[in-house]
Amino acid sequence: MFNVNREYISKKRVIYNLYRRERANKMVEVKELFKNTEEYINKEVTVGGWVRSIRDSKTFGFIVLNDGTFFQPVQVVYNDKMDNFQEVSKVNIGAALIVKGILVETPNAKQPFEIQADEVFIEGESTSDYPLQKKRHTFEYLRTISHLRPRTNTFQAVFRV
């Protein structure tokens, strides 16, 4: 068999888990951002969630991110100054991301604020055939993908009642 240094692998796994736990402890829920906006405006925040929609151009892009804690998602603006701009631009709907950036007010836009991203970590990929797309889905269709129903707006609203 192969001579594997199990102690080295174990230490690496412990360090990685500590790193992830540290990031998770500093994350803010989307619900918290909407309830206490003034507390977070012009400050650095870290938010995690799933991509609801993504649009990009050559120099910047927009991600609509939802973590399931609030009915309204948060918009993330990212630009080509990020190291992984190309990777983030290719992310599909349903991918899990952790975004670190500055929360900025947007008084003339639909949403009250957005996150100007400094870093975007791709925690989990999603394929292009992910069944929940931006469009509205019928209940009949949602019955066929019962494991993903909690990620839809309709079922999130029902669960909050």
Q: PLM features: what roles do these ranges have?
A:
Residues 17-161:
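Class II aminoacyl-tRNA synthetase catalytic cores and aaRS-like
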